[in-house]
UniProtKB/Swiss-Prot annotation:
Paired cysteines (S-S): none
The name this protein goes by in its record: Methylthioribose-1-phosphate isomerase
Matching NCBIfam families: eIF-2B_rel, PRK05720.1, salvage_mtnA
GO function terms (MF aspect): S-methyl-5-thioribose-1-phosphate isomerase activity
Top-level taxon of origin: Bacteria
Binding site for substrate: R51, G52, A53, R94, Q199, N250, K251
Length: 351
């Protein structure tokens, strides 16, 4: 029996503006923010108003389509020059999220051979919309493949938010929960709160509750105890960058969960689209890890909670070694075993 599930969206194209669900306001208010300039798009990404690797790529694509409409130049050469400058500018917003650069490169390549400004503007808008539409289909496919890894009644642990509001729709790590709900397969989510910005506590719980999916919130340091006492059957996470050998960058704390999964003998899955793979890098050691402002740790909702002047180390991501990963779930299926060979083979087939 199929069920209609309410699935929130995070990015909408309005033709002359972009509407983004301001995720910094969740769960207390559902506020959509209107972006009309490339600077506002950049700031929205940096400030985590829009977040999640696929969603960042989508909003960046729309941002480039938007700014291209506002160029006043009459010559295509000058248009391309300005466009490349804005591509480079947007690329400075979140250095670890490979989908950002994938979307920027795709937008850039879409108009490489175009000879008129009007045609370039039209193609950029069409390409951005296509990126969003494709991501929705990709996420649904990831959800279908991921659901095959689980059984009705499973308790599944996740971290951060790799859900619908981090993508075009459905999400990656959360996609099987939505697809399962539609198909009558009950999966219970255990969500790590995900310090310091609380994407699990604020966002994952919010969107799953919106859809009527069972979710239990735990503190990050409860994970081992929860696996031990709550019959956690598996762990599933998203990804911000997966390199050629399968090493995976994701929200800080992900590697902790992978180590716990190994110890307790439960599967640890990564769910991500092919656009999250960066096969130009051979191992996780080559991934640049973004470090964020110390106030994310020293303050909670603006209130100082540590002694002033405390030294802080605040990386946004960690890298999980491939040997800790049971399988990488993509829109093309599940990669297992020799990740370097399987990933290379997958990209040979798609090229």
């Amino acid at each position: 029996m199929s069920t209609i599930v309410t699935i929130p969206r995070s990015v909408s194209w309005k033709g002359d503006a972009i509407a983004v669900l301001n995720q910094t306001k969740l769960p207390h208010s559902t506020e959509y923010k209107t972006l009309t300039t490339i600077e506002e798009v950049w700031k929205s990404i940096v400030m985590l108003e829009v977040r999640g690797a696929p969603a960042i790529g989508i909003v960046a694509a729309f941002g480039l389509a938007l700014v291209a409409k506002k160029y006043t130049t009459l010559h295509i050469e000058e248009f391309q020059k300005k466009f490349n400058r804005d591509c480079n500018y947007l690329g400075t917003s979140r250095p670890t999220a490979v989908n950002l650069f994938w979307a920027i490169d795709r937008m850039r390549e879409s108009i490489q051979e175009i000879t008129t400004i009007k045609e370039a503007q039209k193609i950029l808008e069409e390409e951005a919309l296509l990126i969003q539409q494709e991501d929705e289909a990709v996420c649904r496919s990831i959800g279908e493949h991921a659901l095959s890894c689980f059984q009705d009644g499973d308790n599944i642990l996740t971290i951060c938010n790799a859900g619908s509001i981090a993508t075009a729709k459905y999400g990656t790590a959360l996609a099987p929960f939505y697809i399962g709900k539609e198909k009558g397969v009950h999966l219970h989510a255990y969500a790590c709160e995900t310090r310091p910005v609380l994407q699990g506590g604020r966002l994952t719980t919010w969107e799953l509750k919106q859809a009527g999916i069972d979710v239990t919130l735990i503190t990050d340091n409860t994970a081992a105890h929860a696996i031990q006492t709550k019959e956690i059957n598996a762990i599933i996470v998203g990804a911000d960058r997966i390199v050629a050998n399968g090493d995976t960058a994701n929200k800080i704390g992900t590697m902790n969960l992978a180590i716990l999964a190994k110890y307790f003998g439960i599967p640890f899955y990564v769910a991500a689209p092919l656009s999250t793979f960066d096969i130009t890098k051979q191992t996780g050691a080559e991934i640049v890890i973004e470090e964020r402002d110390e106030t994310e740790v020293t303050k909670i909702f603006g209130k100082q909670v540590t002694p002033v002047g405390t030294t802080v180390y605040n990386p946004a991501f960690d890298v999980t070694p491939n040997e800790l990963i049971t399988g990488i779930i993509t829109e093309r299926g599940i990669i297992r075993g020799d990740y370097k060979r399987e990933i290379a083979s997958l990209f040979e087939k798609t090229s």
